[in-house]
Amino acid sequence: MIEKIIKESREGVLIDIDVQANAKKNEIVGINEWRKRLSIKIKAPATEGKANKEIIKFFKEIFKKDVEIVSGKLNPQKTVLIGDIKKDEVIEILKRYL
């Protein structure tokens, strides 16, 4: 299932995520099979871009690469771009958290 939420692009790898803001801690919860998205929890509230900034920071810590939200900035369903990385590397890293 993990392969279905990750797509390679010219710039890196795209990951479809589903975000729950105002959580107790930042964490990867698992895969939402119905939505075909990686479920994550973020401590920051979903106001004034705070959750988006926290998502970027969280993914930078995990992947040690540049991260950008490419769609869904105003929505809990988002797509993030992890720059300069291969799909296989992303899968291996995510498996450590699942």
UniProtKB/Swiss-Prot annotation:
TM ranges: none
InterPro entries tied to this protein: DUF167, YggU-like_sf
Superkingdom in the source lineage: Archaea
Pfam families found in the cross-reference section: DUF167
HAMAP family (alphabetical): UPF0235
Family classification: Belongs to the UPF0235 family.
Name of this chain's protein: UPF0235 protein MJ0618
